[in-house]
Amino acid sequence: MADVEPTIHHMGDFLRAENAAGRPWLPASHNILRAFTIPFDSIKVLIVGQDPYPTPGHPVGLSFCVAPNVHPLPKSLVNIYKELVDDLGVPMPTNGDLTPWTERGVMLLNRCLTVGVGRPNSHQGKGWEEVTEAAIRALNARTDADGKPQPLVAILWGRNAQSLEPLLTNAFIIKSPHPSPLSASRGFFGSKPFSRANQALVTMGADPVDWTL
């Protein structure tokens, strides 16, 4: 990630300028790079989001995740949970905290790491994509002691995430429409991404993910 450090510094300048202009942004600064805090070699599944929730109190630096005290849940997350329960038969989660997934090898990465309050997509094209795409390339390039690609499943929901597929040449790709209410009924429901991810991991010689929350 050293090659994108100048971009990260540039984004810090951009965010300070936004603050100075009276345009607040999310998530809190200590959560902006939270997706990168899990051990890189532990990552088995990548789930890509577009940008953080633009509602204060909602985004916590992990794609689709909210803090445990947030109710009602964002509608996209409600639909993810419906599909999780339908796919695996696990209990319906009681809150929107996806942190346990990250502790089991799931990277929850937004392509754009910040957003203006109440302004979806407002920070797209400002530089974050260069940072997150560098991370995805590095994930894809990981190899084991024998030089073979490390097991990786990429779950790509919606066209924005699916545009990253060319960077994921060594990953097993699972793609469907986005879980938002606008598109979930067009192929997200019934796509069984969680069981398919586990089947792919086992085929690659890796342990399946415990998706229970």
Swiss-Prot record:
Stored SUPFAM superfamilies: Uracil-DNA glycosylase-like
E.C. numbers: 3.2.2.27
Top-rank EC class of the record's enzyme: hydrolase
Catalytic activity reported: Hydrolyzes single-stranded DNA or mismatched double-stranded DNA and polynucleotides, releasing free uracil
Any one GO CC term of the record: cytoplasm
Subcellular location, principal: cytoplasm
Pfam families: UDG
Gene Ontology MF terms: uracil DNA N-glycosylase activity
Active site: 51
GO terms for biological process, alphabetical: base-excision repair, AP site formation via deaminated base removal
UniProt keywords, alphabetically: Cytoplasm, DNA damage, DNA repair, Hydrolase
NCBIfam families registered for this protein in UniProt: PRK05254.1-1, PRK05254.1-5
Task of the protein: Excises uracil residues from the DNA which can arise as a result of misincorporation of dUMP residues by DNA polymerase or due to deamination of cytosine.
Recorded family membership: Belongs to the uracil-DNA glycosylase (UDG) superfamily. UNG family.
Protein name: Uracil-DNA glycosylase
